Amino acid sequence: MATRTICFPISGYPYCREQPVTFTWIKGSKRQNIRAVHDAVHTTDPDVSILEVSSASVQPEGEAVSSLRLLLHLDSVAQDVPISTVFEATKVFEHGGPFADLLTCEPPKVHKDTRLRTSGELLRYSLEGNEYPTEPYMDSFFEWLYCRALKQFPEKAEPLSRYNAFSDIAAAADSKKYYGDSSRAAAIYVGLAAAGKLSCIDSYELFIAEVYTEPKPLPKSGKSEAASKMTPEVSAPAKETPADELPQPDNANAEVIPDAAQMEHILELPKAT
């Protein structure tokens, strides 16, 4: 038996809901395994429209957004590079990396590079002069790269909106270190698009703030914390001084300004209760 995760986009934090699916693994047949995964999903929900987002997908729109096919434009090499290649080439290990030379290599050669498995523990990612952590959100860098690529190439992203679930047969728990999970990244993108939040993809920090940071609940009054801080405090009303105790003006001909009691009478306003 094997387990894969099905990812469902949602139009609000955290933009993706995950559901593990168990199925019988058939060795050496990715497409049969994909069919088994989808059949397992449809046994509980036959109306789910699911897309496999890997190079083994039978659906052209799914193959087009696999990490081996989906491209990200990098100014540093002045070309479009497969997401899987960017992800591997930017890894920084204890004893090596990043391996910028891999950015211009074909994906099969990249994944066979022994440096990716013999350089010690993965510490972080480094891309075009910027550093990205592996903790506390170990999948966030891959997901951000994937979403950036979809935003750069909207013709690849548009067909995804027709699906409400995604799978990635390559994204087993023991292989995520090397491949990432395209199904989760695709679901997050669709969720962000539905919520009108694609602008958060423009920077890694904004992406983390939107996708990985749970929104604070509003106060019970319904006002946000910021709005509450902006509301000025109301001072206690000043004690009213009797009219006969008010200081008299030096100029007897000066205009007399009515006090509060007189103003109420003049304007015929009801007194506050």
Regions found by a protein language model. Give the residues of each.
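Active-site nucleophilic cysteine motif
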Residues: S175-Y189
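Long, well-structured alpha-helical subdomains associated
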Residues: I201-V234
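A short mid-domain helix/strand-loop element embedded in enzyme catalytic domains
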Residues: C147-A170, S182-R184
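Long, low-complexity, intrinsically disordered segments
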Residues: D244-T273
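Short, extreme N-terminal leader segments that mark the start of a protein/domain
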Residues: M1-S55
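A contiguous catalytic/ligand-binding core that recognizes phosphate-bearing ligands
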Residues: A64-S66, V77-Q152
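Compact, well-ordered interaction domains used in eukaryotic information-processing assemblies
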Residues: I50-E52, S57-L71
